[in-house]
Amino acid sequence: MVSSTKLKSVDFYRKIPRDLTEASLSGAGLSIVAALFMMFLFGMELSSYLEVNTTTAVIVDKSSDGDFLRIDFNISFPALSCEFASVDVSDVLGTNRLNITKTVRKFPIDPHLRSTGAEFHSGLALHNINHGEETKEEFPDGAIPLTSASFEALSHHFPILVVNFNAPWCYWSNRLKPSWEKAANIIKQRYDPEADGRVLLGNVDCTEEPALCKRNHIQGYPSIRIFRKGSDLREDHGHHEHESYYGDRDTDSIVKMVEGLVAPIHPETHKVALDGKSNDTVKHLKKGPVTGGCRVEGYVRVKKVPGNLVISAHSGAHSFDSSQMNMSHVVSHFSFGRMISPRLLTDMKRLLPYLGLSHDRLDGKAFINQHEFGANVTIEHYLQTVKTEVITRRSGQEHSLIEEYEYTAHSSVAQTYYLPVAKFHFELSPMQILITENPKSFSHFITNLCAIIGGVFTVAGILDSIFHNTVRLVKKVELGKNI
C-alpha cells in the first residue's frame, strides 16, 4: 500500500501557511486587474466559440429537387381582365404549356389593386366554341345597334338586354355576326320588343363606341354580356359581378340561352317568378369580374433550363386590340424553389446575415407602361438564378439547413408588332454556392480557456514579483545611503 506521506510528495500545489505570506496593495491592485482581464478574455473566447464559422465554395449543382424547379408568383395587372389572363410556360427544349390553371388562381381587382370579387374560374370560357357552319348568306339586322345614350335607356327599359360587343376587324366577331343576327330575328318574332318587352338583343361596335366598351371592361371581341334591370351587376355574397356568355355561338345555342333567361320572367309584370330556377339553357352564363384588373397568383414547375414565364391575354375564340392592351403590373412576390417559412429565414439571417438578400429582387416593384412608351408595349424581365445551399457538420454528421434560389433581375420595355405580354425570362446557373458551417470543437474551447486563465495568472504573478523585488531593491539602496 502506498502511504499517504509518499502520495503527498507528488503534490504540485504545496500550500504555504497564510501566516508566512504577506499581502500588499500593489498585489491586490494587480490581482483585480488580472481578474477583470481574465473575464474579458473569457467572454471573447466564448463569443468566438459560439460564432458560426463558414466556408464558401462554388460547385456543380447537385440539387435534391430533381430536374424541375418551382416558381412562385403573385402579380397584379390593373388593366388585364381575369377573363382572358393566361399563364404560359416555354423553354429551350421545346416545352410549351399554355393557360396553366391547375396551380394558378385569378382574382379580379380594381385600378388601385384592391380585390373586387371572389376567385375567377375560367374553365367555361376556354372550351371549344361552336360557331355553326360558315355562310355568306346575309340576314336582315335583327339586333339593335346601341350607342352610349340608347344603351342606358334600353338597359333600364328591358328586364333582359343581351349585348354583343364586337369590332368589325375581328375575325371572330364576323364569324358570330350571321348567327347573332339570325338569332336576334328569331327572338324578335317570339318576344316582340313592343308587345312582350321582356328581352332585347343589341350590338355595340367598339370602334365607334370605345368609351361604352371601356366602361364595361371589354378587352376581347366578341364579348356577349347579359344586363338585368338596367345594370350588369348582380349581388353575390357581397361581391358585385356581371354575367357573360361563354357558350356556343351558333344560332340554336344563342336562342336557347336567351329563352332560358326569359323563361322565369312574367310576361305582364316583368318580374321574376318565385319558382324561377336556372336550368341547362343558361349553364354557359358565368359571373365575370366587374373590374378590368386581375391578380394572378400561384406557382408553376419548370425544367432547369432557360425558359419563359409569360402572362398575357389569350383566348381561342376572341380577338384583342393590341394597341389597347396595357400590361402594366405590380409584383408582390416572385421567387424560385420551395417556399421558405419566415421563421426559418429569420433564423438563417441571424446566423448568416448575407443570406437571403436576393431571393425576392422583384418583390414590391411596379412596372407601369407610361404614355411616352406608346402602344403595343411588352414588359420583359431577365432573371439569372443561382442556388445557395447551407449545410452544417454539427454532431459529426453533415445535413442541409436551407436551400434557396437567389436571382438578379433586369427589366425593360419594348414595342412589339404582336400582342403585348409580361415576360419573365429565367436562366439557371449550372453551378451552386455551397456554404458549409464548421463548428468549433469543445476541446479546443477548453484548451484556449485554460491557456487564457493560466497565462494571465502567470504573467500577473511575474509582474507582481518584478514589482515587489524592485521595491525591495530600491529600499535597500536607500537604506545603504543613509548608513
Swiss-Prot record:
GO terms for molecular function: protein disulfide isomerase activity. It holds the Pfam family Thioredoxin. Residues 133-263 form the Thioredoxin domain. Its main location: membrane. Keywords: Glycoprotein, Membrane, Signal, Transmembrane, Transmembrane helix. It is a single-pass membrane protein. It comes from the Eukaryota. The active site is at residue 170. Widely expressed. Glycans are attached at residues 53, 74, 99, 279, 326, 376. The keyword Signal applies. Acts as a protein-folding catalyst that interacts with nascent polypeptides to catalyze the formation, isomerization, and reduction or oxidation of disulfide bonds. This is Protein disulfide-isomerase 5-3. It comes from Arabidopsis thaliana (Mouse-ear cress). The gene is PDIL5-3.
